[in-house]
UniProtKB/Swiss-Prot annotation:
GO terms for cellular component: small ribosomal subunit. Disulfide bonds: none annotated. SMART domains: Ribosomal_S10. One of its GO terms (molecular function) is structural constituent of ribosome. It comes from the Bacteria. One of its GO terms (biological process) is translation. The gene is rpsJ. InterPro entries: Ribosomal_uS10, Ribosomal_uS10_CS, Ribosomal_uS10_dom, Ribosomal_uS10_dom_sf. This is Small ribosomal subunit protein uS10. Part of the 30S ribosomal subunit. Belongs to the universal ribosomal protein uS10 family.
Amino acid sequence: MATLQQQKIRIRLKAFDRRLLDTSCDKIVDTANRTNAAAVGPIPLPTKRKIYCVLRSPHVDKDSREHFETRTHRRIIDIYQPSSKTIDALMKLDLPAGVDIEVKL
């Protein structure tokens, strides 16, 4: 039996600031719900931690080091049965610059 493949938009969001990421996710889900599309998410993915070890002194003291870390928070939102209104509303949506957005159809 042949089944019809459902149309789906997958939106991946990445940010260093968790609160900024969550507000962006809320805006996307609200926009999808206003245009009668079914939004699933935001689904939290594991946070990536990158730790940098730096010498404190420019000269001799190798024992004295300092650690810095960056945390990359990630979320996925799936939008099922998107209409042209949904796509237009998502294109016009104003999101902060600190959030990286990747869209797949």
